Amino acid sequence: MSGIIIKERMFGKETAMEKVYIAIDLKSFYASVECVERGLDPLDTNLVVADKSRTDKTICLAVSPSLKAYGIPGRPRLFEVVAKVDDVNSTRRMKAPRRKFRGQSNIASELNSDPSLELSYIAAPPRMALYISYSTRIYQKYIAPEDIHVYSIDEVFIDATAYLDTYGMTAHELAMTMIRDVLKNTGITATAGIGTNMYLCKIAMDIVAKHMPADKDGVRIAELDEMSYRRLMWEHQPLTDFWRVGRGYAERLRHCGLFTMGDIARFSTSEFGEKALYKMFGVNAELLIDHAWGWEPCTIADVKSYRPENSSISSGQVLQEATEWATARLITWEMADMLALDLLGKGLVTDQLTLTVGYDVKNLQIEDIRRSYEGKVVLDHYGRAVPVHAHGTINLESPVSSSKVITEAMMELFDRITDCCLLVRRITVNANRVVPESEVKEEIIQLDFFSDPEENERRRQRVQAELKREKSLQLAMLGIKEKYGKNAVLRGANLRDGATARSRNRQIGGHRA
């Protein structure tokens, strides 16, 4: 695909595609890393990455390919894995000599050759720091950091344009070289997509590669340009296979008689069709239409240089069990305190906070709560009745990163929007309208006839002095945490029953580090 230059003019839109992008998805990455760490073959070992110390409803972060072969999906709940393995073993027992197992194995090849073995699997607790370490060292041997966009721990986009001449390779050869190196040094195999823009390489990887036969090492590499995309993908269904097309989008498109990307592309050529798409999706219609035609103007350089006009920082957690209101309030306080430290560490301030509190499905299964609750009821993803979540926003007097100001405001908001009789399961805190502290303009004070300007100035100076002292303390805490670990210094509230900050400090992305 290297060297391909396609220039077209369609409906007044010219595209010059000279770039070559590679998307790489490390296959069952977390599970593969855990297998490699144990000296096991990632393609021949039954393993799930899941924290068994949580409830059996915990989500498995990864499932090894051999275990997926039994019909277990990629991101199941742990109880679903247990149930499926029990079903498989019931069938295997019927075929075993004397209908009895003589042992068990988590190795697929052994299970395939010996029907007297019971299927078992390894449940590996997640180790996010280890996965990040593997991920960061895989690609930088070949590609400079500025040409890599890390989409997730196990998936990257690479702008390979400048490297094809350097290495004297085609894009396919470069992708294969990197994947073979990964396989040789880690035992982890991969799927890759090559395209003339970031969207096409993603689709090549997500759809085309995953529907083609793998080589002897499980490697799949597919390529797309605009013309082959239209030829191969315009009739592909379902639409939800495509990047950024969720069930909601697909349902709205279906009501308009649009079932494929080809349908959307053809529909967009008429003035009526284009207006209808913009009416349905607003400004997002432009991206949908571009993708229907295989266009994507955004480059990795654009992604790296992007700075949103209105930035925000958020933190959320799903509690391990239905939690009483007072404990949820303590956890919210901890999250607000950590949010303030995060802002300070990044040199940012905020003047608006948002809180979302999700209630547990058990609420409406408890007789006393069900009788007394008079609020709105909604259905969750599984069709179960649950009280509608609480959501609210509070504005601060001025942009700050003060833990005292932020926690007090968040507690005021929590008390205002939540129902103290309900059990809580999810909490999300947001700092909105985040800006660098250096960009905050000095406040203009409006004088009036009814207040003493000198007293107001003295009050303002006292507040500023308090904020300055608190900032010094917060910076000292940050320094200790960065040097000795996040749990090296804690507040007294973090030691109370039900507090989660200490355990969260040992996690990355909500999972064990």
Protein language model features and the residues they cover:
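Gly/Gly-Pro- and Ser/Thr-rich, intrinsically disordered tail segments characteristic of DNA damage-repair
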Residues: 2-300, 449, 454-513
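Generic "edge-of-domain/loop-turn" microfeature
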Residues: 54, 165, 199, 318, ...
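C-terminal hydrophobic structural anchor segments
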Residues: 412, 416-479
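A glycine-rich phosphate-binding loop feature that marks nucleotide/adenosyl-phosphate handling sites
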Residues: 196-199, 290-293, 349-361, 423-435, ...
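DNA-contacting surface of Y-family translesion DNA polymerases
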Residues: 23, 241, 247-424, 444
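Short aromatic/hydrophobic contact patches that present stacked aromatics
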Residues: 157, 395, 428
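Short, charged/polar surface micro-motifs in flexible loops or helix N-caps
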Residues: 27-29, 53-57, 359-364, 434-438
